[in-house]
């Protein structure tokens, strides 16, 4: 999937342990729902537009999505990436609204984006319910009236090439591209979804415009609307807004070509046997093994059994391939997935090798493990566990309305039936052991697979830095005049009066031992979301044992006094719940979720591992090797190297935040170090737990008291006081060079503010104007949209319990890096000296408030917000008063923040990736 823009991803989850105790104590035991389409209504307008609506009244928000039945599957050789290019062009304005649509979406406070995949291209936005009609009007406008001109295409082609070069930085991407082309040499499924630089360079405006007219028509689209509305009212609006649209005369010409593609695919499946592995010897860090097996299309009856097979093979620590490859020490990680599409599918396995292991040996072990399933069969409990995990994953992934709409849109465009997931879940429930063995025999044949090896030739990165320099640009890049907010207002569809939202506040409890708990019952779905925080982050790492805090967090689930690692994992996987610990600079974050009936088990495991973890030697050493491999991979990743170098350039050597793990520091960490750190920092008075979901408040409080109330420790928890850090006197450039990288990652910034700073809310408004959105901000409009220099550029105030950083992050082609940095620096100077405008402030405030309200409709984001408000020692009513504080920010306060918090001539500039020529730097 290729997004229009992308922000850093969230952490992964680890599967956790369950048992059958305590069900009746919190909720009545319920039958797991096997439908995601209840209350869905489908109509087809006279012009052929398919409309799906679903009322969900859990929060005053709605999502609008338009799915076009066109993706990379529809591309011919030489035009690879045109669907993705068109996706980008759809934000460049229409005949009626010649303005960047990102600015309109931002003004609505919409969480909007788009993506291109194999079978479809989708555009989606989630807003407060009073903005529903405005979103519908904008989507209808760009369905038929998009401006696609030569000047805009030239600029956006540079953005797309920047995006593609960013993917080229990843060895996984390069290996996958080679393997897929070999597996599907005669079908568009074998081409990269985003295209290639060579093809994108050749796109002509008429070519893209014809593609738009051909495929972007009502009879080739699905409109999905989910959220807080009345169906009859919405359908009237939809008929009025979309019913008048006409289909292009070109809209049906591609049906014959798609049939030809399908025939070619059938031939290819019998001819694309790779007898020897594809071997890539290129710059990189870790060794990789990828295997692809062809599979049937989404509507074939074997698909449910194939997904159950995948869970048995790779999901969790008890899975067959985890045991054969990771637990044995051959591999650092194994991931896999079944892809089921309109015309075909595939099963893809990706293995990251452990240090010094041979890929051929790993491949042999992989083949043996799969053959062993066929020869010896599988157990009924494995199938039962996989089916439970799979079904729970579907339910847990559909807690928010955006995800529910995504499920409907994907099913309707891929399987031609929005009810597909219901049928699929029913079929999954019927899968037996024999069915799983049968699909392995049928599809995972050694002669049918395509294999790829990635063998790295990487050398360690080297760092090029220079002395601080004076702050003048090498060229005077002229900045465009920002589009006036009056222009946004001119083209924005009418919006109804904004609703007043009254938020229910969580109940807060502090136990006698200092444990803080926040509980918010929410019966909208039969699920529970857990977030937690322990004051045991990487800031406490000893300088010579950097990485210790993360090692402790990573090993908590590896055994307790009562249960070993496999017993924990097995019991967890039986319920499809999740629990994950991840160390950050400030604190260890805990994330978990489960079906409501399994909350007692989730809390039982949480209590057991934070209180009774034993850190077995075998698992500790295996984790050390995995961590060393991960470090090796991170030092080949421009984003990770840029972040590490940026932080170490800001904070002096003796500062707690300067320390990062190295091979030497990780090798020096002993089991005693781990046990001592855990005993010192993991305490009830350093722990905060937040729960949101379907539970009885009093019973959960009682259960928490039972599990945690007798946890006693002595003394006071450790505290850190950071030394004061001065800004650099002048601009500092650092350029860590990584061989073989196509795209540069740049961080620009310095120390900033903490969450308690009185300027915090003004800083948020300032940041929204500066770089809060890659399409609508000053930086986005100038560097990305007008000049086409970056796929994505953002700014942040990272304000924590202690002073964090202000940073600007961008991705650029090496030849554009200097110009992008100089334009960014000049824009910082402009805002620092001249300030921003009153209309910009009002628009930014409205955007922040709307985004906040939309985000809290997602249970995970709501739980995290409740948790962190407590961690930052904010009043409980902050959940409700945040929007009022944003609304009260004035223009004078924002411009004062610009003068006090923007320091364009005292900035650290780190660019990781290809070498940046000295003459490109700010001087």
Task: Label each residue range with its predicted role.
Residues 1-6:
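Classical Sec-dependent N-terminal signal peptides that target proteins to the secretory pathway
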Residues 59-72, 81-85, 99-142, 174-198, ...:
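M16 family metallopeptidases and their MPP-like homologs
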Residues 82-90, 309, 551-552, 766:
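Active-site His/Glu-centered metal-binding helix of metallohydrolases
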Residues 161-167, 268-282, 386-397, 594-595, ...:
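Short, conserved secondary-structure transition motifs
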Residues 304-307, 326, 761-764:
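PPIase-associated folding chaperone regions across multiple families
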């Amino acid at each position: 999937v290729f997004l229009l823009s992308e922000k850093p991803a969230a952490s992964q989850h680890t599967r956790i342990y369950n048992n059958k105790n305590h069900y009746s104590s919190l909720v009545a035991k319920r039958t797991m729902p096997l439908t995601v389409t209840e209350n869905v209504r489908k109509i087809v307008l006279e012009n052929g537009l398919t409309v799906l609506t679903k009322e969900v009244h859990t929060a005053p928000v709605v999502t609008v999505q338009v799915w076009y039945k066109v993706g990379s599957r529809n591309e011919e050789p030489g035009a690879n990436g045109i669907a993705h290019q068109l996706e980008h062009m759809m934000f460049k304005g229409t005949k009626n609204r010649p303005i960047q649509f990102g600015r309109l979406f931002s003004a609505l406070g919409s969480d909007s984006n788009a993506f291109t995949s194999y079978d479809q291209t989708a555009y989606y936005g989630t807003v407060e319910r009073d903005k529903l009609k405005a979103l519908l009007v904008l989507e209808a406008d760009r369905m038929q009236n998009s401006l696609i001109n030569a000047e805009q295409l030239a600029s956006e082609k540079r953005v797309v090439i920047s995006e593609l070069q960013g993917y080229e930085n990843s060895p996984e991407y390069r290996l996958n591209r080679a393997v897929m082309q070999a597996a599907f040499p005669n079908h568009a499924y074998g081409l990269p979804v985003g295209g290639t630089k060579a093809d994108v360079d050749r796109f002509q405006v008429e070519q893209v415009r014809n593609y738009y007219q051909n495929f972007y028509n009502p009879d080739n689209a699905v409109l999905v609307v989910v959220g807080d509305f009345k169906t009859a009212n919405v359908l009237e609006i939809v008929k009025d807004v979309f019913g008048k649209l006409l289909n292009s005369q070109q809209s049906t010409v591609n049906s014959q070509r798609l049939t030809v593609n399908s025939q070619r695919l059938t031939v290819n499946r019998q001819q694309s046997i790779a007898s020897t592995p594809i071997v890539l010897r290129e710059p990189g860090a870790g060794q990789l093994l990828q295997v692809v097996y062809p599979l049937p299309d989404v509507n074939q009856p074997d698909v449910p059994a194939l997904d159950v097979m995948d869970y048995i093979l790779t999901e969790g620590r008890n899975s067959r391939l985890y045991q054969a490859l990771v637990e044995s020490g051959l591999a650092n990680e194994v991931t896999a997935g079944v892809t089921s599409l309109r015309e075909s599918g595939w099963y893809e396995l990706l293995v990251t090798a452990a240090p010094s292991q041979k890929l051929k040996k790993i491949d042999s072990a992989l083949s043996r493990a799969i053959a062993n399933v066929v020869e010896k069969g599988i157990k009924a409990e494995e199938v039962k566990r996989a089916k439970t995990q799979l079904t729970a994953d579907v339910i847990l992934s559909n807690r928010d309305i955006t995800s529910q709409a995504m499920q409907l849109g994907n099913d309707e465009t891929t399987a031609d039936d929005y009810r597909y997931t219901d049928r699929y879940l029913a079929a999954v429930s019927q899968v037996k052991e024999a069915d799983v063995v049968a699909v392995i025999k049928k599809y995972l044949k050694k002669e049918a697979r395509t294999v790829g090896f990635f063998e790295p030739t990487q050398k360690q990165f080297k760092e090029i830095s220079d002395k601080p320099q004076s702050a003048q640009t090498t060229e005077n890049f002229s900045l465009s005049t920002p589009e006036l907010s009056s222009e946004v207002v001119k083209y924005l569809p009418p919006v109804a009066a904004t609703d007043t939202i009254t938020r229910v506040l969580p109940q807060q409890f502090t136990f006698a031992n200092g444990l803080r708990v926040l509980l918010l019952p929410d019966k909208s779905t039969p699920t529970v979301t857990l977030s937690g925080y322990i004051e045991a982050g990487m800031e406490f790492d000893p300088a010579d044992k950097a990485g210790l805090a993360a090692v402790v967090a990573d090993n908590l689930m590896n055994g307790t006094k009562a249960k070993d690692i496999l017993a924990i994992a097995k019991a967890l996987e039986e319920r499809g719940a999740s629990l994950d610990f991840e160390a950050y600079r400030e604190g260890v974050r805990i994330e978990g979720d489960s079906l409501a009936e399994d909350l007692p088990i989730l809390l039982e495991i949480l209590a057991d591992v934070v209180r009774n973890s034993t850190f077995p030697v075998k698992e500790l050493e295996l984790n050390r090797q995995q961590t060393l491999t991960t470090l090796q991979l991170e030092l080949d990743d421009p984003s990770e190297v840029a972040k590490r170098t940026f932080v170490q350039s800001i904070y002096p050597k003796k500062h707690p935040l300067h320390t990062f793990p190295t091979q030497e520091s990780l090798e020096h960490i002993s089991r005693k170090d781990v046990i001592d750190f855990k005993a010192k920092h993991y305490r009830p008075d350093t722990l905060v737990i937040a729960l949101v979901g379907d539970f009885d408040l009093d019973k959960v409080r009682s259960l928490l008291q039972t599990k945690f109330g007798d946890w006693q420790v002595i003394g006071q928890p450790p505290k850190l006081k950071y030394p004061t850090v001065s800004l650099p006197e002048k601009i500092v450039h650092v350029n860590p060079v990584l061989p073989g990288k196509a795209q540069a990652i740049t961080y620009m910034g310095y120390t900033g503010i903490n969450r308690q700073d009185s300027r915090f809310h003004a800083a948020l408004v300032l940041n929204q104007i500066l770089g809060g959105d890659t399409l609508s901000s000053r930086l986005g409009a100038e560097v990305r949209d007008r000049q086409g220099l970056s796929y994505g550029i953002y700014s942040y105030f990272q304000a924590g319990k202690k002073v964090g950083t202000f940073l600007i992050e961008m991705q650029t082609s090496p030849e554009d890096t200097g110009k992008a940095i100089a334009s960014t620096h000049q824009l910082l100077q402009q805002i620092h000296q001249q300030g921003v405008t009153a209309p910009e402030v009002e628009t930014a405030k409205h955007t922040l408030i709307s985004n906040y309200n939309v985000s809290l409709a997602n249970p995970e984001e709501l739980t995290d917000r409740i948790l962190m408000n407590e961690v930052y020692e904010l009043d409980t009513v902050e959940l409700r008063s945040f929007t009022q504080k944003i609304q009260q920010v004035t223009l004078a306060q924002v411009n004062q923040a610009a003068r006090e918090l923007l320091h364009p001539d005292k900035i650290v500039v780190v660019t990781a990736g290809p070498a940046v020529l000295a003459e490109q730097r700010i001087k």
